[in-house]
A protein has these predicted regions:
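Short, surface-exposed, charged amphipathic helix/loop patches that serve as local interaction elements
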Residues: 23-29, 37-124
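Short, hydrophobic/proline-enriched secondary-structure or compact coil segments at domain edges
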Residues: 8-18, 66-74
C-alpha cells in the first residue's frame, strides 16, 4: 500500500493513433493504454538510456520500451469492439505507424510526465 495519496503502480493514458487513410486523409483512432509507472529515479535512468541509444546499439528500442511498459489497452477493432491485449496484438500494433507512435508517446508520457510532454509538443 502506498503511503502517499495518488501514488499508483500503473496509469491509464489516453492515446490518439493517426492512421493514413484514403485520399491523403488521416483517420484518428482514440484509444488508451495502461502503462507501468516507474519511480522517478528509474524513469530518469530509462530516459537517459533512450537519449544514449546511439552508444547502446540502439537499445532500448521502441519495441522493447512498449513491450516492457504497456500492460494493457482499450483499443477498438474493425467492428468497434475492443481488441484483447496480447503479445500478438501488441506486435501487430507496433507494425502500424500510427498505433506505434501513439504507444511510444504513452510510454514517454509516463517517463517524462504529462506537463513536460505538453511543453515538448508546443516547441515542435
Amino acid at each position: 500500500m502506498a503511503l502517499l495519496k495518488g501514488k499508483q503502480d500503473q496509469i491509464i493514458i489516453p492515446l490518439a493513433a493517426e492512421l493514413d487513410a484514403d485520399h491523403g486523409k488521416l483517420l484518428t483512432v482514440r484509444c488508451e493504454a495502461t502503462i507501468k509507472r516507474l519511480p522517478y529515479d528509474e524513469a530518469q535512468d530509462v530516459f537517459r538510456a533512450i537519449q544514449n541509444r546511439a552508444d547502446n546499439s540502439g537499445e532500448p528500442s521502441d519495441e522493447t520500451l512498449v513491450s516492457r511498459y504497456v500492460l494493457g489497452w482499450k483499443m477498438p477493432g474493425p467492428d468497434g469492439t475492443d481488441v484483447p491485449f496480447s503479445d500478438e496484438a501488441l506486435q501487430e500494433a507496433l507494425q502500424e505507424r500510427g498505433y506505434r507512435d501513439a504507444l511510444i508517446e504513452g510510454v514517454m508520457t509516463m517517463l517524462l510526465g504529462k506537463k513536460v510532454m505538453e511543453r515538448l509538443r508546443q516547441k515542435n
